[in-house]
UniProtKB/Swiss-Prot annotation:
Pfam families: YbjQ_1. The lineage of its organism: Bacteria, Bacillati, Cyanobacteriota, Cyanophyceae, Synechococcales. SUPFAM superfamilies: YbjQ-like. Gene3D superfamilies: Hypothetical protein apc22750. Chain B (3.30.110.70). InterPro entries: UPF0145_dom_sf, UPF0145_YbjQ-like. PANTHER family: UPF0145 PROTEIN YBJQ (PTHR34068:SF1). Belongs to the UPF0145 family. This is UPF0145 protein sll118.
Length: 108
């Protein structure tokens, strides 16, 4: 399945627009990982565990996005954007939210 952050595909014709597709991935935070991430932040290091979570989340969100586009009969998704955020659930933690959006299309 073709995926692109642009709204055109060079050398290809968009034969049909199927509509907007979205996908969401949500991860719970881990208190121990948060503790060590906080220490790394204080000393200026990178928080590799969170980087890995976001990388995994991006991959999973794109995979879900293309799966939903296929269900609409599309063979591509254009204008793909991935955003991240947090949802505070209480004073003990938060949820990490990764969303992907795009337009499902059929390209020739």
């Amino acid at each position: 399945m073709l995926t692109s952050t642009t709204d055109i595909v060079q050398g290809r014709t968009i034969a049909r627009y199927h509509g907007i597709v979205t996908a969401e991935v949500v991860y719970g935070t881990n208190a121990l990982r948060d503790f060590f991430a906080g220490i790394r932040d204080l000393i200026g290091g990178r928080t590799g565990s969170y980087e890995q979570i976001f990388e995994k989340g991006h991959r999973e969100a794109i995979a879900e996005l293309t799966e939903r586009a296929q269900k609409l009969g599309a063979n591509g998704v254009i204008g793909v954007a991935v955003n991240t955020g947090t949802i505070n659930i209480d004073d003990r933690g938060a949820l990490l939210l990764i969303t992907a959006t795009g337009t499902a299309v059929t390209v020739d």
